[in-house]
Amino acid sequence: MGKKINPLGFRLGANQSHRSLWFAQPKSYSRGLQEDEKIRDCIKNYVQKNMRSGSEGISHIEIKKKIDLIQVIIYIGFPNLLIEGRTRGIEELRINVQKGFRSVNRRLNIAITRVAKPYGQPNILAEYIALQLKNRVSFRKAMKKAIELTEQADTKGIQVQIAGRIDGKEIARVEWIREGRVPLQTIRAKIDHCSYTVRTIYGVLGIKIWIFVDEQ
């Protein structure tokens, strides 16, 4: 039963917070959600085009909206991927995102916050595993290496799951590995989670990661 519900939504208000902070009337609520999605997509596309490494390194993106301002905070594990050798990197990103959606009366402000322990973030870890799978590294080797990286971030437990046509086998299957404790049913346990999709030469693989950060 522990895998039937999203661990982030299950803990909202306890030890997880919303990543979009704004208020809208019911008629314009869907428009606000679409706007958030466009902003996140624009940022990820820009980082993919301008990065030197094979991964984005973005942990998550927070969006705060006011009447005349949209504040975007990018939590990134490796800021150099975005701004290395580019003095106007953030300004270029802001202009690029501004073009992606129509916002005449609101200013767009983008800030970058560095994540202290990048490999303690499930999104960054999933990108690492995806990159290994694209390079035809064995899925078991990729999962074990990911767990080794997580141990450096002082986490209490991790579970990694890969589903699909693993290693090009004709029948799709699910493989998973767990290290330490991952108490999914304990609400006071802070658990970070992500679902990530990667396209390989054999087809689409789904990666899910649960990281037990701490107990409050």
From Swiss-Prot:
Residues 43-116 form the KH type-2 domain. It is found in: Plastid, Chloroplast. One of its GO terms (cellular component) is chloroplast. SUPFAM superfamilies: Prokaryotic type KH domain (KH-domain type II) (SSF54814), Ribosomal protein S3 C-terminal domain (SSF54821). The keyword rRNA-binding applies. Pfam families: Ribosomal_S3_C. Keywords: Chloroplast, Plastid, Ribonucleoprotein, Ribosomal protein, RNA-binding, rRNA-binding. Belongs to the universal ribosomal protein uS3 family. This is Small ribosomal subunit protein uS3c. It comes from Drimys granadensis. The gene is rps3.
